[in-house]
């Protein structure tokens, strides 16, 4: 039986020998050395992941964690709270942004209810902790035990999907007001004032942004999360969707498989996961630079450079779906290009 400790202890660094071998092969392909730029770096990163059998990925999946947030009551979003459950239903119909992009990328979408403030939505994986987290502006989002249990449950869900053949994961989230706890988590882990982190989320009016900043600042002051303790931070100022995404990262990394990040809330979850197990970072693939204000700061602390710059801020896992094409391209380059030595071409470099 898996425990959170056993999953964390199974996370190891990338295989440097395999990565060096891949770099040598890439340098021998029919192209100038390094001319594929970061696509080559991606192929080398994938080579170091012991869960992959060469550069072959047969099944891809985006896990979307869905939850409501008590801090919604502080007026930090203009979207109706009911939109969380309604949009989760739309995901089951396959008509949302992530569903369309995932289908285009050859990936399936698994939608998980970790805390929707509604009755169970048909078709969703039911891992509901509560009907919405606590209001972080008034107290903790959840208990420490709830955070630990959800981390483990999410990691185990990921391991279950791996037994079903999934080799590449993306993470996504859905939940009205969730950029507020995400901003709180990023503020704590990066030691920045919320003024530097808080953004407009789902079109929150810029003239009211000072209120959202104040709410995040109040949440941190009231809960006093310990930045050295990821679970404490997630429990006090996070949310069920953030915890769920962090659990996916831990689970995939524990068996050496990659996880593609999405936008700002996934950066918050990644910061937490990497504090729990620093080697998780090597299994993360940053898809795009979210347009949310604190994104650059979060990614700098993760030491990750996003591949795509599209001014996106939809969430759901939409950026992860787009980046799956890049992973496919890196594998195709490695597997299918010819060798320079067999091309009758002699390059001066």
Swiss-Prot record:
Extent of the signal sequence: none
Biological processes per GO annotation: cobalamin biosynthetic process
Catalytically driven reaction(s): 5,6-dimethylbenzimidazole + nicotinate beta-D-ribonucleotide = alpha-ribazole 5'-phosphate + nicotinate + H(+)
Pfam family, one: DBI_PRT
InterPro entries reported for this sequence: Nict_dMeBzImd_PRibTrfase, Nict_dMeBzImd_PRibTrfase_bact, Nict_dMeBzImd_PRibTrfase_N, Nict_dMeBzImd_PRibTrfase_sf
Entry function: Catalyzes the synthesis of alpha-ribazole-5'-phosphate from nicotinate mononucleotide (NAMN) and 5,6-dimethylbenzimidazole (DMB).
NCBIfam families reported in the protein's UniProt record: cobT_DBIPRT (TIGR03160), PRK00105.1 (NF000996)
Family the UniProt entry places it in: Belongs to the CobT family.
HAMAP family: CobT (MF_00230)
Protein name listed in UniProt: Nicotinate-nucleotide--dimethylbenzimidazole phosphoribosyltransferase
